[in-house]
Regions:
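An N-terminally biased module of ancient metal coordination in phosphate/nucleic-acid-related enzymes
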Residues: 13-110, 120, 181-195, 202, ...
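Short amphipathic alpha-helices and their capping/turn segments at secondary-structure boundaries
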Residues: 39-52, 111-125, 156-167, 193-196, ...
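Hydrophobic alpha-helical segments and helix pairs
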Residues: 98-143
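Domain-core and long-helix interface of multi-subunit machines
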Residues: 129-230
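Mid-to-C-terminal alpha-helical segments outside catalytic/metal-binding sites
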Residues: 249-272
Length: 272
C-alpha cells in the first residue's frame, strides 16, 4: 500500500481503542454476501467505540432489467424492505445511545439510475454514498480496479462526475479505487479532473479505512496529494464489514497522519 505500513493482526489488537471520529456513514451488513455479523452487533460496537452516528450503507439491491445477471456482492432485491425495517427498529431501540441512519452504497449506472432511485425511494433512505466499482455497469464486467487502459480511467471519472452531479450522493467512497496502472499523464489528468469536479459540486471524498486495514492499493497517498492540491474536503469511512471494524482505531490513526502531512481538510462534523 502506498504510504501506509503493513497492518497485522497484532497491531490491530494493540490499537483497539475508541475511535476519534464521531460519525461513520459507511457500514455494511451480511446481506451483501461479503460481510459478517448481525445488525445489532454493529450498533453495539459503534456505541462502545464512542460514535455518535452510525450510518448503515449496505450495497444497494439493483434492478437490472431484462437480464439473468446475478450479483454476488449486494443484497437481494427482495431484502430491501427487511433491511430498512431492521435498521429503523434499531434506530428506535437505541435512540438514547446513538443516532442510526439507513442508507445505501450505490453505483451510478446512467441507463438504470432513474429506475433504481424509484425503487430505493420505496424505503425513503436517509442518504446514499457513491461507491463506483464498475465502468458502464456490472453487465459490462469492466471492474474498475482491473483496468489499465487510459480511456478506462477517463470513462470512470466521467461516469462518477455525472453521477455526483445528480445531487443524490452524500459523498464519494474510495475515489481512487481504479488505482494507478494507467499512464502517469492519465493519472495526473483524470484524478485532477475528478477532484476538481467533486470540489465544484461540494462533495467530499472518502479516505477508506477498510483499504488501510486490508492493505489494499487504496487509499493512495498519491491520489490524496492531488486532492490536497485541489483543495478537496475529505471524510473518513470505516467501510465496516464486521462489527469489530468499528473498534479498530489503528487505520484511523494512519489516515489522520496522512491528512495532517498533506494538509487535507477533514470534515469532522455531521454530514446530515
Amino acid at each position: 500500500m502506498q504510504g501506509f505500513p503493513r497492518i497485522t493482526v497484532d497491531i490491530c489488537e494493540k490499537y483497539r481503542y475508541n475511535l476519534s471520529m464521531l460519525y461513520n456513514y459507511h457500514t455494511h451488513t451480511k446481506r451483501c454476501k461479503h460481510a459478517e455479523g448481525k445488525d445489532k452487533k454493529y450498533v453495539e460496537q459503534a456505541i462502545k467505540a464512542g460514535l455518535k452516528t452510525l450510518g448503515f450503507s449496505d450495497h444497494a439491491p439493483y434492478l437490472f432489467p431484462n437480464t439473468d445477471y446475478y450479483s454476488t456482492y449486494r443484497m437481494e432485491v427482495d431484502e430491501l424492505h427487511e433491511y430498512a425495517r431492521s435498521i429503523r427498529a434499531l434506530k428506535k431501540e437505541y435512540a438514547k445511545d446513538i443516532e442510526i441512519l439507513c442508507g445505501f452504497e450505490l453505483e451510478y449506472y446512467p441507463k438504470f439510475h432513474a429506475r433504481e432511485m424509484e425503487f430505493l425511494n420505496q424505503v425513503n433512505p436517509d442518504y446514499l454514498i457513491m461507491g463506483q466499482h464498475f465502468i458502464g455497469n456490472e453487465l459490462s464486467l469492466l471492474y474498475a480496479p482491473r483496468q489499465s487502459e487510459d480511456n478506462m480511467l477517463e470513462a470512470y471519472v466521467s461516469q462518477v462526475l455525472e453521477g455526483l452531479a445528480t445531487g443524490h450522493f452524500l459523498y464519494l467512497a474510495h475515489p481512487d479505487l481504479p488505482g494507478f496502472r494507467f499512464s502517469k499523464e492519465a493519472v495526473e489528468r483524470e484524478y485532477t479532473r475528478l477532484c476538481e469536479g467533486a470540489k465544484k459540486l461540494n462533495i467530499p471524498l472518502e479516505i477508506n479505512l477498510l483499504g488501510i486495514r486490508e492493505n489494499r492499493p487504496y487509499p493512495s497517498r498519491k491520489f490524496f496529494e492531488i486532492a490536497a492540491r485541489v483543495g478537496n474536503s475529505v471524510v473518513l469511512g470505516i467501510d465496516a464489514h464486521d462489527p469489530s471494524h468499528l473498534r479498530d482505531s489503528y487505520p484511523e490513526r494512519l489516515a489522520e497522519n496522512m491528512i495532517n502531512d498533506l494538509g487535507l481538510h477533514l470534515i469532522e462534523e455531521k454530514l446530515l
